[in-house]
Amino acid sequence: MEEYSSLEKKIMSILYSAGKPLPTERIAKQLDISRITAKKYLLGLEKNGKVGSKKEGRAVYWWLNSSSKVLK
């Protein structure tokens, strides 16, 4: 069973609630953390297949993969 940090759970919950891809900056703002910290956790979740991403211009948009379960 995979274990997630409190921040990873919050990120997945935000993405689930949004129902659409969100840019790194918006996720960071909702969590009151830096974009660098948000990106670090998002990249870890992406490596584990929990989220996907796409770069558009200067922004990177993130979404929860459909196979991912949100842990509250």
Place the predicted regions along the sequence by residue.
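Short amphipathic alpha-helical interface segments
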Residues: 8-20
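Alpha-helical DNA-recognition elements
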Residues: 44, 48
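A short acidic, leucine-rich amphipathic alpha-helix
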Residues: 26-28
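Residues within the DNA-recognition helix of helix-turn-helix
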Residues: 41
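Short, cationic-aromatic polyanion-contact patches
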Residues: 1-8, 23, 55-72
